[in-house]
């Protein structure tokens, strides 16, 4: 979740490979392990690459797709439309998907954007637009996923002082709570429908076995 230099880079764009890996980790463990593969048709996602199993498994499940059958473009920043499409494929709940943004009519991902919005994964801007071709930052992605998982601490008192902190995620930043939530493994108790209060920090899952 963080980088080797100790930063978390909340305002950096999130890549297609990073997004695939996030949703790979959100899979039910039985589904993830039952479909785990390191094989794919992409020439730019190969054996030994850190994201190979994540991308390969998610492609096998049909949740992510390449630019073409041979090109995944793992390091490219993901757009809001591409992110919405992954959300819409990942979440199998039924919805009518009637959310209508003013700038998605005729867009290649119009149906998936509407579905992802109806499911609560994504939201538009106050002016009624979705801006499908804009890139998503790491902080925005964390916030969206936390919201859907109903994992939203409401203030600093809901956190624990011994948590991992980041020099580029300050308490005054709009994304502070979302980033702390997404980057610290912990137990918690509920506060309302979507809020939570941390009760204990826990060891982070060992994801290296999937690299």
Language-model segments: residues:
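Alpha-helical segment that forms one wall of the substrate-binding/catalytic cleft
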Residues: 139-145
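Feature responds to low-complexity, polar/acidic, surface-exposed segments characteristic
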Residues: 1-17, 24-52, 61-81, 89-111, ...
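C-type cytochrome heme c attachment motif
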Residues: 85, 114
């Amino acid at each position: 979740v963080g980088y080797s230099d100790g930063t978390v880079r909340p305002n950096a764009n999130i890549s297609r490979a990073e997004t695939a890996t996030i949703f790979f980790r959100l899979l039910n463990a039985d589904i993830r392990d039952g479909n785990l593969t390191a094989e794919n048709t992409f020439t730019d996602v190969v054996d030994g690459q850190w994201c190979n199993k994540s991308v390969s498994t998610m492609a096998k499940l049909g949740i992510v797709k390449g630019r073409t059958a041979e090109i995944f473009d793992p390091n490219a920043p993901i757009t809001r439309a591409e992110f919405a499409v992954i959300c819409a494929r990942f979440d199998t709940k039924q919805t009518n998907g009637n959310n209508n943004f003013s700038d998605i009519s005729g867009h290649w991902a119009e149906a998936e954007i509407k579905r992802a919005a109806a499911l609560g994964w994504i939201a538009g801007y106050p002016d009624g637009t979705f801006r499908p071709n804009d890139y998503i930052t790491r902080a925005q992605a964390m916030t969206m996923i936390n919201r859907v998982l109903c994992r939203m601490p409401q203030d600093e008192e809901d956190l624990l002082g011994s948590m991992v902190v980041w020099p580029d995620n300050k308490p005054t930043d709009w994304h502070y709570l979302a980033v702390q939530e997404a980057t610290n493994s912990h137990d918690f108790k509920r506060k309302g429908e979507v809020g939570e209060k941390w009760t204990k920090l826990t060891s982070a899952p060992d994801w290296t076995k999937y690299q």
